[in-house]
């Protein structure tokens, strides 16, 4: 369904989020999924498939996982939960960007620190989070409409950002409450769509 929707609406890529692989093993595919078949079908429709993965699993299985995903026809990987910028993590970004480039795959560093110029060396880095994005509504009230109006000017200048827009359960800031299960968005649906 998502591949067909993307093809109908000119959306270049879809993301298959958590659940396609084993919790701690990217080389184990959930038996209820068939990523190679999805990639094959998507390619026929002109849509690329990206997969979500935890950084710790990528770190342990970098070469094997990227070779496997590339062989399936996966076009990119969204890597999550790095949440720091010490020397070991910066080295991880470099190793992953290099391997992804070798495999001709895009990267989305989610749960990342803000950009620092790495895209100049690795144009396959599509985006990175490095921002208080909309998913913060699960645990914080910091992602206000005013914040969302400011970040294109204060954060976006450094490079593309993975903001995760699109909240459709909307309330005004004074009615907002933090909810991890059914997160709300502050403001209006029109604001989210803009």
Cite the ranges covered by each PLM segment.
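An acidic-aromatic substrate-binding cleft motif
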Residues: 1-4, 9
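Short loop/turn motifs at secondary-structure junctions
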Residues: 9-10, 73
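Core alpha-helical transmembrane segments of integral membrane proteins
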Residues: 10-16
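Aromatic- and carboxylate-enriched substrate-binding clefts and catalytic-loop regions
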Residues: 17-188
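Catalytic cores of secreted or luminal carbohydrate-active enzymes
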Residues: 194
């Amino acid at each position: 369904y998502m591949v067909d929707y993307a093809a109908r609406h000119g959306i270049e890529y879809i993301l298959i989020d958590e659940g396609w692989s084993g919790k701690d093993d990217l080389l184990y595919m959930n038996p209820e999924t068939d990523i190679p078949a999805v990639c094959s079908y998507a390619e026929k429709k002109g849509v690329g498939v990206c997969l979500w993965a935890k950084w710790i699993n990528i770190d342990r299985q970098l070469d094997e996982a990227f070779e496997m995903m590339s062989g399936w026809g996966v076009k990119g990987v969204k890597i999550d939960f790095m949440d720091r910028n010490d020397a070991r993590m910066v080295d991880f970004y470099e190793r992953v960007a290099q391997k992804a480039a070798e495999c001709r795959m895009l990267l989305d560093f989610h749960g990342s620190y803000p950009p620092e110029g790495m895209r100049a060396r690795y144009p396959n880095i599509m985006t990175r989070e490095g921002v208080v994005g909309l998913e913060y509504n699960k645990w914080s009230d910091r992602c206000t409409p005013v914040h969302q109006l400011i970040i294109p000017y204060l954060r976006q200048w450094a490079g593309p950002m993975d903001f995760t827009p699109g909240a459709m359960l909307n309330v005004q800031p004074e009615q907002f409450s933090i909810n991890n299960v059914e997160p709300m968005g502050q403001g209006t649906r029109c604001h989210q769509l803009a």
